[in-house]
Design a protein with these regions (language model features):
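Extreme N-terminal tail/first-helix region
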Residues: 1-14
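Short, contiguous, well-structured surface segments enriched in hydrophobic/aromatic residues
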Residues: 52-63
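C-terminal structural segments of small proteins and small subunits
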Residues: 94-102, 107
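Conserved small/polar residues in nucleotide/adenosyl-binding loops
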Residues: 121-129
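N-terminal first-folded block
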Residues: 11-46
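Charged, amphipathic alpha-helical oligomerization/scaffolding segments
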Residues: 15-18, 22, 55, 81, ...
Length: 129
């Protein structure tokens, strides 16, 4: 958890990794987008997952605009789309589409987690120049 002060690159990457873990744990029983609306408990899962997607997007945005960006090496990840999703969640929450959230969780987070893990183990991220 954030305890104040300036976040380092590693702090931001760790927040992304933690968020991916939480989302994957919370959404284990979600098998389709409609499951998010099946009960109040599932709506809470949806809201929690979306909040963590927002955290991921916020941290990606902070890392994306660093010069040089530690993310620039991994062009296979749609970094700007991740940041754009954060903006949608933050500014147009009622327009968040359950299907897009479901697809993101089930199809995209695994690859993102692999890249974030690689970034955490690179000396550039660890050095935090």
């Amino acid at each position: 958890m954030y305890k104040g002060g300036r976040l380092t690159i590693c702090d931001r990457l760790t927040q992304i990794k933690e968020s991916i873990y939480y989302i994957q744990q919370w959404s284990k029983e979600i098998n389709c987008a409609d499951d998010f609306l099946a009960s109040m408990d599932k709506v809470m899962v949806f809201n929690a997952c979306v909040m963590r997607l927002q955290v991921i997007g916020e941290q990606v945005g902070k890392l994306l605009f660093l010069q040089p960006s530690p993310l620039s090496e991994y062009k296979e990840i749609p970094w700007l789309a991740i940041y754009d999703m954060r903006n949608l969640i933050s500014h147009e929450y009622s327009n968040v589409d359950e299907q897009i959230v479901f697809t993101t969780i089930k199809n995209d987070l695994i690859e993102l987690d692999k890249v974030i893990t690689c970034l955490l183990y690179t000396s550039d991220a660890a050095d935090d120049k």
